């Protein structure tokens, strides 16, 4: 894509921690590979995650931030959120218990259910950005899974003064 005049960037990593990297180091991947701007999509609060501890998750975020600082890149960690009642607990602990700012962690799928959405508004009001996921069959997801419809969620976020992004994925 870059050769065709488009800008294309990516993350290093995987759902699980320890993350899979190209150089065996998050910091090295971000510093040495031009297109890598952060780490993701790390799964937490979900049955698909590796159930990382606070220390493991905080280390991934810290390494990603360090790689970003040293390379002049974003150093963002994109975090896949499931529908566990723990919601953003690990993310909030990193922000509250370390020197890493909320702006370094981008939780996605925040409209997965009403409880998670409410917690995400609180997180965004503390300085974090959040990411919606637009789904194909919105009636199904809203009715069966308690998902917050993107258009309604965006309005609620904007009314609260929050910063939002919308994730579009080719595979759902």
Predicted features along the sequence, with ranges:
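Divalent-metal coordination cores built from histidine and acidic residues
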Residues: 1-56
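Glycine-centered loop/turn motif at secondary-structure junctions
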Residues: 4-5, 127, 161
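Active-site core of metal-dependent hydrolases
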Residues: 49, 56, 62-155, 165-170
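Redox- and metal-dependent alpha/beta enzyme cores, enriched for Fe-S-associated oxidoreductases
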Residues: 156-160
